[in-house]
Amino acid sequence: MHTVCLLPLLFFTIGGCLGSSRPFRTFVVTDTTLTHLAVHRVTGEVFVGAVNRVFKLASNLTELRAHVTGPIEDNARCYPPPSMRVCSHRLVPVDNVNKLLLIDYAARRLVACGSIWQGICQFLRLDDLFKLGEPHHRKEHYLSGAQEPDSMAGVIVEQGQGPSKLFVGTAVDGKSEYFPTLSSRKLIDDEDSGDMFSLVYQDEFVSSQIKIPSDTLSLYPAFDIYYIYGFVSASFVYFLTLQLDTQQTLLDTAGEKFFTSKIVRMCAGDSEFYSYVEFPIGCSWRGVEYRLVQSAHLAKPGLLLAQALGVPADEDVLFTIFSQGQKNRANPPRQTILCLFTLSSINAHIRRRIQSCYRGEGTLALPWLLNKELPCINTPMQINGNFCGLVLNQPLGGLHVIEGLPLLADSTDGMASVAAYTYHQHSVVFIGTRSGNLKKVRVDGSQDAQLYETVSVVQGTPILRDLLFSPDHRHIYLLSEKQVSQLPVETCEQYLSCAACLGSGDPHCGWCVLQHRCCREGACPGASAPHGFAEELNKCIQVRVRPNNVSVTSSGVQLTVAMRNVPDLSLGVSCSFEEVTESEAILLPSGELRCPSPSLQELQTLTRGHGATHTVRLQLLSMETGVRFAGVDFVFYNCSALQSCMSCVGSPYPCHWCKYRHVCTSHPHECSFQEGRVHSPEGCPEILPRGDLLIPVGVMQPLTLRAKNLPQPQSGQKNYECVVRVQGRQHRVPAVRFNSSSVQCQNASYFYEGDEFGDTELDFSVVWDGDFPIDKPPSFRALLYKCWAQRPSCGLCLKADPRFNCGWCISEHRCQLRVHCPAPKSNWMHPSQKGARCSHPRITQIHPLTGPKEGGTRVTIVGENLGLTSREVGLRVAGVRCNSIPTEYVSAERIVCEMEESLVPSPPPGPAELCVGDCSADFRTQSQQLYSFVTPTLDRVSPTRGPASGGTRLTISGTSLDAGSRVTVIIRDGECQFVRRDAEAIVCISPISTLGPSQAPIILAIDHANISSTGVIYTYTQDPTVTHLEPTWSIINGSTSITVSGTHLLTVQEPRVRAKYRGIETTNTCQVINDTAMLCKAPGIFLGHPQPRAQGEHPDEFGFLLDHVQAARSLNRSSFTYYPDPSFEPLGPSGVLDVKPGSHVVLKGKNLIPAAAGSSRLNYTVLIGGQPCALTVSDTQLLCDSPSQTGRQPVMVLVGGLEFWLGTLHITADRALTLPAMVGLAAGGGLLLLAITVVLVAYKRKTQDADRTLKRLQLQMDNLESRVALECKEAFAELQTDINELTNHMDGVQIPFLDYRTYAVRVLFPGIEAHPVLKELDTPPNVEKALRLFGQLLHSRAFLLTFIHTLEAQSSFSMRDRGTVASLTMVALQSRLDYATGLLKQLLADLIEKNLESKNHPKLLLRRTESVAEKMLTNWFTFLLHKFLKECAGEPLFLLYCAIKQQMEKGPIDAITGEARYSLSEDKLIRQQIDYKTLTLHCVCPESEGSAQVPVKVLNCDSITQAKDKLLDTVYKGIPYSQRPKAEDMDLEWRQGRMARIILQDEDITTKIECDWKRINSLAHYQVTDGSLVALVPKQVSAYNMANSFTFTRSLSRYESLLRAASSPDSLRSRAPMLTPDQEAGTKLWHLVKNHDHADHREGDRGSKMVSEIYLTRLLATKGTLQKFVDDLFETVFSTAHRGSALPLAIKYMFDFLDEQADQRQISDPDVRHTWKSNCLPLRFWVNVIKNPQFVFDIHKNSITDACLSVVAQTFMDSCSTSEHRLGKDSPSNKLLYAKDIPNYKSWVERYYRDIAKMASISDQDMDAYLVEQSRLHANDFNVLSALSELYFYVTKYRQEILTSLDRDASCRKHKLRQKLEQIITLVSSSS
């Protein structure tokens, strides 16, 4: 069932300058995607097409009906669809995407066309969506199987009395032979009629359709026509299309696809399509072309627009949206434009084109359809506007683009859909955008298009193409992928003033005056009265009031209100001030109003706390409507709030300053006497500006200030004072007023603490009468300064501000005033003195200290007393002149100079030498540092390659690269952006390559030196691309994993993934796995609103930062979705939850499973007391098993970078038993134990024989199995959680299947990864010719049989040789598997005959590989069962491998012996109690330090290598083993704090040695704690490591021969333990158990012929845990139809062959036939694959996993055996382990063989066809010449024997095969 929810009120905010919000209705879906919309033109009902659904909604968007259309079993390659004919391709449920939704009004039905079954349509009844019909049995019923929902357009043309016609255009997705791109079809009344959708006209030459020619698709495979919009105007049908611009695409060197827009026109009554014309169409604005049509709408122009265009008002016009340029059709640029076309203009262009063609001018110009240029034929005739074509001069293409009239451009939102209608005299256009907005545009002329409103509808989600009006045009319906929205066409009520209303530009809106609201004219009660409804801005009411301000001390002032544009007010008006006061107004004869100002009491309420002025609104209230309909601002002013004379008299209101009272008043008579009143700024007392007031510290002096209008203190008033505030302290100094223009602060000195500043600003003011300040100008400053502060040297002193008058006191060596220096005439130096210069210059530093001898280096010299001007300083550096740069000179402190070239061949180092003025001793100095000339060199660049777009961080290595002052790195002709440098390396960012992928030289420019090296070349490669993301969603917080597929990813150094949402960009880290894959953590996004939508948020941009590759910054086709973050409820109100040990804990939450498509899920980790628990996840809760510990344990949930602390679990065990109960139980138990003991003793004496011992053993096994059932159940549940988590992240491709080639080579040539058959053979021409002749000879059955039999007859032809020859033969015959199969059958028949002749038991046939035929049989199955492995059997085998690996790694595994706590193999079982703890380490991902840490479970007893393997397994989960780093290539780094980092190793100087035993290090050895932070870093080779590595290599060499003979090819790692004891060094390594202990224990164990109970318990527990996975694998292998896969033909064919051979030889024993089949398939193929899953998957198999798989393989073999399964006390434990299961498995095998025997036989012809197809699929996987060369080795070795055999065989003699072989031998010999 579908899930939809109706949200009748969903608020949004309009953009631009508007800020109100209005509700609108929506219809939202969550489990489908909406594609199309239709609105009934009468009823207003809304029909919505979607993926797998069609909805019917009421006009208010209430859901009325829903009709299900899919998913349907289908396959895109099935034609006709599977409903009509059985399809050979696999059928799967396919979504039905609605591509066309039309209302057939004449037949009262809905036409809904989808994508399934090659694009069939359904007819639905309008009333209830009942399916009236679904024609699908004729080819005309299939419109197109293309999946794009918006590539089809249709128009229904009603024909009065006759049936309607459907004109439909569609993309055909390359299948032009099946579907016409444009056609005219019949709409029959009977929906099931065979004639439904038949072409309107069709004969053998002409039909009413257009098809894309196959020649066009051959030339341009991507060619297609996408139909955007269709409509009818007058007697014509039009379509707007997008199609490939073949000319532009052909000319583009970069391979870009270009598209062009065209308008297609045909006569509606033209059944032969003779009238077909298409014209390019587009728009241009400011010189930029817009050629990608997005949407269009046919409408009538408003009167104003029609007049501006000069067309009639009933003329059709076409509003069209175009995107900029011609590229990126699927995700076009956001630069878009709204354009206008008149149909009369389009038709005129078409008419002129037809007329010119009928005059014989030019060609038909339609290359995509005609594939050649056909000339127009001169045919004189009258062509008018309704001409519908003839059989000639058609179809016709336009030569020039029909240009539209640009109306509105947009570069941000991306306009995507358009609708328009006429309101009054205006054309109103509505535009949907890709950012989810609705734009409203008023178009009144070609230059008069005004965007007047933008409404946010579905922010960040594109509005789709269908944009439709309700029948009354009061609402508009918008469609997005998840939502239908109904918006009113206007929301006038949002405008709250007349100016806002009439200035908005919305033509629907006017101002209802007495109602004081914005609305349509029809909604205004008094609209018909004069001035009752305003529609123009100058018609708004204008109000003025006289006076417009009043003092707060005045009341009852009569105010006169004048008004314009007011309606009749005779029913009365009242005046109000902010609802505080209201009074009735008097209407004067002049039309003015008279109102009183508020009373004093009301004024206090209005103005209290508002300072000097308060503006209030004087409002007019209509007695007729009770509404305040107009208003004007009115000011109340308060002079007394102004505190200074200047602010008082500068006020715009009548305020006066009382000078002697120091107050401001609105009443001048309040001043005490006349001369104290000031009413202008010129009369204010004020300190006059005179520059800064400079005050030296510690100098006793008066301060005289100029002023004006200084008042004379009167009797009783205090005198003047100067108030100085410095460092928080206030000083008052008496002052004297000399006159009204002068005041002097008396003698005083001033100080400030500290010498950190040379001067400080004072807060300085002049006051009188205690606290009356004199006004100061804003620029007035008082500075207090110290000469000596921050001026310790002469040079610094002389460069001080000259206004301070500071100078250098020579004898005091101090900067001070002249008055403080003794004998200043000769002892005090000031810059004003002529020739003043400081002696004893000193250089403290020079930089740089090295530079090229070519010069150009800018040397910076820092010191003191380095002159006062650059002109007086002379410089030489290392004996070379250095020219001062005046602009860089800092007086006395710093000189920057540029070195000249040194002319000395090898100049020595030298100091910098400086003279000030002259070079006498006192004015000369040199530096202690020496400057050296060097010759920089360039050695190499790393990396050596990077993307052509640049952005790669390059490290350029060499010598002396830090020399000089400036460095520029040039790569070909672009500058590499400098980052940093040192002596050995320069780091810079590569520029873009102007030549694309190519090699570029590198040149270093260091100052004036240019350095290059011919051997240092940087290679620009193809830019990396991103092709696929999995999954395409995250949560708002991000930090979930994304697997990214692409190309050239290894060229990127620091990839990051980015998202941009609402203008805010976020990034996260990526880790490159290989050239085509990387793992990223999704970036989070910041929401502007508190709650994200359930259906998800789409970022504005989503892409990748791949160096400077711009194309990846925003993925064109990305539909990345962010779903709400999960949230959790706390554990009860108190945050504490009481539970019992082991019971389930339910954690409730929301959004736990995002509503995303696909199988990907969030990864949750629940920690209880720091320990993870097994989880079951649903949408609203996590089900978690609490751990067995007790007490209070905190609960934390981790997901996607989020951490949730939910509270505390209080885990309490049941109360202990009471003492009497315990005594009673103990006594009862003792008696019971005694009774059992007596019985067992008696029983033992009576049961001595072996059978009874067996039964007792079996009984013990059963009892033990029951006893460990609970343990098994718990272990299985935990493992099941792990496996479920694993399978949740596995999606077909994520099972790391090896490719066919690698798989085949691993089985055919085990242990040889790089076999010669995988490589090209480099050989002389003669030898190559000979090998090709040898290959032809192998295709002679007589020769090949003789060749193989001869080799087998040789005593030196070893078992290994037999296998090699069999494999090489199969490879050589890979392209002829039919021939190879016949040969194999003959060899098997010969082998059976030989077996029977030698009197061997028939059951021994195929048991061992003693012949070439047996190995060939294995290889034959290997080739032919590969598909079955990938599609069916591979998954359970992979899950079994994963289950074994995970179960083994949950307990300790000995790194030396390979023994484990959990094992299926008795030989690999640890027989001691090992104490261990589980740790969770937080691992920093390799190569991506900034990414999120990964929690990894390890054991504290794990060796370091074991821990590294577990870390790598987790960090690189899902990555094939060959594509990830290896443990031996990485170091494990334990990070403790910011700086402490410890490298952990299996052996180091801390390794413990006791006697001659050395214990390898574990995590416990290093005391690594739970929760530790670790990192995997590239291997650091130290002297110790190198020595260790050498010792280790020597140790391994002793095992090499043994390992090479092993069946597993997975290198040394699969069989060898991780570490090998170094016996040569005299010490033995051990990990968990010592070898001798283990040996002793085993000896005793085998002596008793039994495994002790504790060890057997572990075997049983492991077996029980893995039981389901073993069962699944066996069930899959022994089933004839499993998981939807049929039995492979090869099995049935070979089993039938064996039955035939048995029949021919009269072998009737069913056990023999059973055994032959078991030896043939399970033993030869399946056992090999089960024991060696690395043959099938890209994985690593360690020794303990290998041992367990061997037990499973043995059980598999036992299940196929026909012999009785006898067990005894000497039986191995693994047979005892599966004793109860094997009978059941045997029944499966017997049933499997029976079912195969019952199947219909496969004919040789059918089998040959199958084998030929298999040969074709893999014909080029191996190099046949290499295989022939390897095979020819045996010809050389046994040359004489083979030639003799060829002579003896009659058939060989007949065909002269000996001579042919000798010819080959001669050819080979001649080249040696």
Curated annotation (Swiss-Prot):
Residues 20-489 form the Sema domain. It is found in: Cell membrane. Residues 20-1220 are extracellular. PROSITE patterns: SEMA. Residues 841-934, 936-1021, 1024-1123, 1126-1212 form the IPT/TIG domain. GO terms for molecular function: semaphorin receptor activity. It is a single-pass type I membrane protein. Disulfide bonds join 78-87, 113-121, 267-388, 283-339, 357-376, 492-509, 498-540, 501-518, 512-524, 575-595. One of its GO terms (biological process) is semaphorin-plexin signaling pathway. Gene3D superfamilies: GTPase Activation - p120gap, domain 1 (1.10.506.10), Immunoglobulins (2.60.40.10), YVTN repeat-like/Quinoprotein amine dehydrogenase (2.130.10.10). Glycans are attached at residues 60, 549, 1163. The modification Phosphoserine is found at residue 1597. Residues 1-19 form the signal peptide. InterPro entries: Ig-like_fold, Ig_E-set, IPT_dom, Plexin, Plexin_cytoplasmic_RasGAP_dom, Plexin_RBD, Plexin_repeat, PSI. Its main location: membrane. The chain crosses the membrane at residues 1221-1241. CDD domains: IPT_PCSR, IPT_plexin_repeat1, IPT_plexin_repeat2, IPT_plexin_repeat3, RasGAP_plexin_A, Sema_plexin_A3. Residues 1240-1294 form a coiled coil. One of its GO terms (cellular component) is plasma membrane. PANTHER family: PLEXIN, PLEXIN-A3. This is Plexin-A3. The gene is Plxna3.
